[in-house]
Amino acid sequence: KLRREWVKDKKPEEALKACQIFCENADLTGAGVIIPGVNDGDVLRQTCNTLEEWGAKGFILMRFANTFNEGLILGNEPILKGIESQPVEEFGQLVEEINKEYNFRVTGTPLCDPETGGPFAIAKDENEIFLQFIKKVTGEATIITSKIAAPFISKIFDKIDADNVNVIGVPKEIACLITKEDLEQIDLSEVKQAVIIPGRAFVHQLDAERILSADGVERIVGRGPDTLTIDGELSFDKTDENVIEEELTQFNDLVDAINFFGMRI
């Protein structure tokens, strides 16, 4: 019934039968967009019970996005009127709960991966020992990122005593979906002369330079790595060691960008 109504699947029984066949004969990781009041709660548990019974390898929970700040950047929001997405922290708790309740691997996007500690596993206190492998920060810069990523990135740079780096989180929740509208909301008095924006931000370089220099201060705008961690969509077959190693590589690339664009003379 849910597939017929929400996915417009003309033959939902056949789709579920195919899912069962794949579960029983291959390593299948399913994915579901969790819409509050539609397929969460008891419905979600029923889905998980069925997947576990069929022998699924894993399940990726995907938080429903319904606003511009949640990632709908094409002016087509809301997708569903009258439905509010779960708060990010509450969604992360849901992922943790489902992972504990079932025998298959459960991850979530944008949060979290209970098995690896991601995203930003190196921000966790128990992983602080790995921060010694991040290069020394010699430059001075402002990092612009998403609302979700900002606290994690700030914590990491605080722990490595990078006093000349500050982190600004825009209201957009996903860093690679940052647009020029997000940059226009930034208080430029908090922005240093060198700025690092996400590598995959949806902002033209000329727009970024114009917007971030609108107060008369000509700023250098560089791009950091495409990613700084491994999202739950990609980490479901990773170990905690894999994630930490990847994050260290990406943060060293970020430090390289800071030291280059924010070189102090």
Which residue ranges define each predicted feature?
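Auxiliary Fe-S-binding modules of radical SAM enzymes
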Residues: 45-265
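Conserved AdoMet/S-adenosylmethionine-binding subsite of the radical SAM
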Residues: 1-71
